[in-house]
């Protein structure tokens, strides 16, 4: 069995295609996992979808046929041609897939290295797949190690100190444009995590924030959480507010643009629209007074961020590498379990037969049979303890073959485990 990861990110796929690939809607995510799971070669799968990436992580029997099936499933659901997906996708297998997963969880593969949102998004994607029975023990164990790795990266590096997200980069861009934005007012559309982060960064810069959301109760709740610099307005005020204020940040989960040319009025002051949603919320024409920044337009600030964090990222990648090795060593030790079980079953079988013979021949009283069984089993348990420990330390093919030959047992094993440590 093999781990595979198919990745579409800001590195290999433009925002227009990423919009089509988005699985952030639960119904859509459920459907892609259903299509993927229809292939008998794919035992487990999960789908991660954020503004900067779409990832499918799977545990499969045959890598090549599974990868083709996954790409074909995405093509069927999104109508993006198979060839276009195949051309763009970064594909990782086995050790590469686990290393990539750990790097993603540790925010080393993010548009903004060190941003803290990705861990929560990954946990949510895993929980969704687990609750819907699309993944089991093999992806669960990988995710457990991934979150452990991410925690170690946060603890041993400064890469996530002063947390940075796409939302904070958008606010940083506004500061770059205006200098001091304290005292200004900004409209934030949406009440989800990205909107909340944008609003919080604006308030930290002493900007008055107006929250607009289709669900007015959510807008009201968020405004209350943010404090006295935050207020809210009903969604039917959207057109009025985006034509009144200079700073507009939008991060809704809408499937189509909510700000279009039809609701834009001509004004004689500069307005800056920050579209931090995927799919995009804003589809308007720019002119001398209207400026639009989408997720991909923020890469210049992100590159600066990368340069500042390069040394810490190097340390973090070292942790990811060690965690990847530790994961496969753990998998290998778990792979020794069938051998240990086979030895103990063999010992138990022999003990039971010999005790029965002893009873039949009169060497052992029938009333003492249970106590004798317990004693013999304890002896075998003690005898097999050291071999069991040694097997977990080095579960090599030669040792397993020798055990099969010497004790006449059959050991079921995963041929792929040891190869990942070479």
UniProtKB/Swiss-Prot annotation:
Enzyme Commission number, as recorded: 1.2.1.70
Q: Which SUPFAM superfamilies match?
A: Glutamyl tRNA-reductase catalytic, N-terminal domain, Glutamyl tRNA-reductase dimerization domain, NAD(P)-binding Rossmann-fold domains
Pathway, per UniProt?
A: Porphyrin-containing compound metabolism; protoporphyrin-IX biosynthesis; 5-aminolevulinate from L-glutamyl-tRNA(Glu): step 1/2
Q: What is this enzyme's class at the first EC digit?
A: oxidoreductase
- Location of site Important for activity? 100
Per the entry, what this protein does is: Catalyzes the NADPH-dependent reduction of glutamyl-tRNA(Glu) to glutamate 1-semialdehyde (GSA).
Q: What is known of its domains?
A: Possesses an unusual extended V-shaped dimeric structure with each monomer consisting of three distinct domains arranged along a curved 'spinal' alpha-helix. The N-terminal catalytic domain specifically recognizes the glutamate moiety of the substrate. The second domain is the NADPH-binding domain, and the third C-terminal domain is responsible for dimerization.
Q: What is this protein called?
A: Glutamyl-tRNA reductase
